[in-house]
């Protein structure tokens, strides 16, 4: 390439970079104008604030120079030491430097711009580089690295990549700082696969061995490789690629990269979220072997997983190990333990932990009390739950929606409806769970119309009723034999975009069958089968039972036989309703065949199975078979129910059975 063509090429690249920076600044100015308009037209008076603010994605806008706390800084430049008492002074001197070209070079400009980078003003730094470009002050690799970092900090990754392309076109060799900055930018944008590919390239080409550049990176405000590496590891774990993250850590340890407690903590947390507690514990042991001291975050993550899995003894052992090693548990650690104990009904152990944390002067928070209150309510200890609420208020910890919901549920369970309603009225912002709890109470009391009023209140408050809300009300209407209202509500549910689930379908199917509306039930059943809702065994049991009650035993048998085609496994209840159907039409031989098939398929008959079949045999006059079944029933620990005993008593009264038969049932 000739000198003229080289100059032309550099000029084209230079012009392109200026255009990119101008685009970024124009976008910035538009963002600022919009924000200023919204805030009442606030203007920034200093002429230096022409340097645009690049809007940060998902963050607050950058502060003005007058808002930044700057305590002054001294720089050694070509002309000697210069002290800047304010950022405005630094901009003044920078303007003087670019006018004094070629006395001041990119090295001096970079030092001044570094002040703004360290003060978290990448927007100003970008604008100052624009001035350098306009004045034809050549940028060096150090300049490009700062510029790439500034674009990344402003979440303008496309500009960072464009700048990277331009520096390579100008013949500069990207270094570890360049790659590390881009890697960090990709991680910030959640472009983990691309970051992983770039990191792999860095490993292969030996860039990660240039650790001597760490000082330079810190000087201009860049993060060292290990911190960016942690960002990458965190990204992999967030995507569920924990095994890849662990393999990458092992690889980098082999290459001599120092892995800190943050890296291990990220991997341990990822493993725990996957439920792989064994690997997390192995990694904990490995940390100790490499003399990296685990912190409370790592211990808490493992303890939390152990508690969730019900391994409370292991969690307690690890908790004790923490204390022995001088690692102080925090409120999160205690909350994990308390919540774990509460979830498995170990309320007294949870109470003991609460006392322990208070003795250690670790203040419980609302999550601590919520776990204990919820457990108290589930255990039926409403008085203890009320005492815990009082303790919360005494400690100036204000109840949240979860607290109120637990207490309302507890009051409802103990039929203290007035207290539940009073607490509901106290809530500033009840959620849909709160409404569902109160609606359920109304429906159980057969006050479904009042439950419907609460459904309308949900909409008025800007909340959205969910599947549970509609299921509760539909069930309520079915219970009061108002199937038309139940159907109307079902249609409303669909029209409002709330998806019915298997429970919704089962409620309606049961309502139709119980009210002898078999045709409507079968019609709905057919519609559901064509939908995306997966019917469960309960749904088929309801329909088979409805068919048998409606004298459609043969059709019920056909449906029973088709269950494997639908991917449904019959349970004891399925066999019971079918056996009952056969007995109802006096098909005792079919009932007996199904009874034996039931046992062959691994389903043990229950009390209902035996009593149904015994009554069927007695009705058909098969006394010997009924005696055989009674003997088997008693040997399996079951006994005659009220219907069987009454039937036997009637047969004895009519003289069709011997009195000794009654003794066999007792």
Curated annotation (Swiss-Prot):
Belongs to the PPR family. P subfamily. PPR repeats lie at residues 105-139, 140-174, 175-209, 225-259, 260-294, 295-329, 330-364, 365-399, 400-430, 431-465, 466-500, 501-535, 536-570, 571-605, 606-640. Keywords: Repeat. This is Pentatricopeptide repeat-containing protein At1g64100. Coiled coil: none annotated. PANTHER family: ATPASE EXPRESSION PROTEIN 3, OS08G0290000 PROTEIN.
């Amino acid at each position: 390439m000739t000198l003229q063509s080289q100059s032309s090429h550099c000029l084209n690249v230079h012009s392109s970079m200026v255009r990119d920076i101008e685009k970024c600044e124009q976008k910035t100015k538009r963002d600022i104008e919009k924000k200023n308009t919204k805030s009442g037209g606030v203007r920034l008076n200093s002429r230096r604030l022409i340097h645009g603010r690049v809007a940060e994605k998902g963050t607050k806008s950058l502060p003005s120079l007058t808002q930044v706390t700057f305590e002054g800084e001294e720089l050694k430049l070509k002309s000697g030491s210069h002290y800047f008492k304010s950022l405005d002074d630094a901009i003044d001197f920078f303007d003087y430097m670019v006018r004094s070209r070629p006395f001041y070079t990119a090295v001096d400009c970079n030092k001044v711009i570094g002040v703004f980078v360290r003060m978290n003003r990448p927007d100003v730094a970008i604008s100052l580089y624009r001035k350098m470009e306009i004045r034809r002050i050549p940028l060096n690799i150090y300049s490009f690295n700062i510029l790439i970092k500034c674009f990344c900090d402003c979440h303008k990754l496309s500009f960072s990549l464009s700048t990277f392309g331009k520096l390579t076109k100008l013949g500069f060799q990207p270094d570890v700082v360049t790659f590390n900055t881009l890697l960090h930018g990709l991680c910030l944008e959640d472009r983990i696969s691309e970051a992983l590919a770039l990191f792999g390239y860095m490993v292969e080409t030996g860039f990660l061995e240039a650790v001597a550049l760490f000082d330079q990176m810190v000087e201009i405000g860049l993060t060292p490789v290990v911190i960016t590496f942690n960002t990458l590891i965190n990204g992999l774990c967030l995507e569920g690629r924990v095994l890849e993250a662990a393999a990458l850590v092992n690889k980098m340890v082999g290459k001599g990269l120092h892995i800190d407690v943050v890296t291990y903590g990220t991997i341990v947390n990822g493993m725990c979220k996957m439920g792989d507690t064994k690997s997390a514990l192995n990694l904990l042991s490995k940390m100790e072997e490499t003399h990296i001291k685990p912190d409370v975050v790592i211990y808490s993550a493992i303890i939390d997983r152990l508690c969730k899995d019900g391994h409370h003894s292991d969690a307690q052992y690890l908790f004790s190990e923490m204390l022995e090693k001088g690692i102080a548990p925090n409120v999160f650690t205690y909350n994990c333990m308390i919540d774990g104990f509460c979830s498995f009904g170990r309320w007294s152990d949870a109470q003991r932990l609460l006392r322990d944390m208070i003795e250690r002067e670790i203040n419980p928070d609302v999550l601590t009390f919520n776990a204990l209150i919820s457990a108290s309510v589930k255990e039926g200890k409403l008085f203890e739950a009320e005492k815990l609420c009082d303790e919360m208020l005494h400690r100036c910890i204000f109840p949240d929606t979860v607290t109120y919901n637990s207490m309302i549920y507890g009051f409802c369970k103990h039929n203290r409806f007035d207290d539940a309603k009073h607490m509901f009225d106290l809530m500033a912002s009840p959620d849909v769970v709160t409404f569902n709890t109160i609606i359920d109470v109304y429906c159980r009391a057969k006050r479904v119309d009042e439950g419907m009023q609460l459904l309308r209140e949900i909409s008025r408050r800007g909340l959205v009723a969910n599947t549970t809300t509609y299921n509760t009300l539909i069930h309520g209407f079915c219970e009061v034999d108002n199937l038309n209202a139940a159907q109307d509500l079902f249609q409303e549910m669909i029209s409002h975009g709330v998806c019915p689930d298997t429970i919704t379908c089962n409620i309606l199917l049961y309502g139709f069958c119980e009210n002898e509306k078999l045709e409507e039930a079968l019609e709905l059943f057919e519609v559901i089968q064509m939908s995306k809702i997966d019917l469960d065994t309960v749904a088929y049991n309801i329909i088979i039972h409805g068919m048998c009650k409606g004298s459609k035993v043969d059709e019920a048998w056909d449906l029973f036989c088709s269950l494997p085609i639908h991917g449904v496994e019959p349970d004891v209840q399925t066999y019971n309703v079918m056996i009952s159907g056969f007995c109802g039409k006096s098909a005792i031989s079919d009932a007996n065949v199904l009874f034996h098939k039931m046992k062959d398929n691994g389903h043990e008959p229950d009390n209902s199975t035996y009593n149904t079949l015994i009554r069927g045999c007695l009705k058909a006059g098969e006394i010997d078979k009924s005696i055989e079944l009674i003997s088997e029933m008693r040997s399996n620990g079951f006994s005659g129910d009220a219907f069987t005993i009454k039937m036997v008593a009637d047969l004895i009264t009519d003289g069709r059975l011997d009195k000794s038969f009654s003794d066999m049932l007792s």
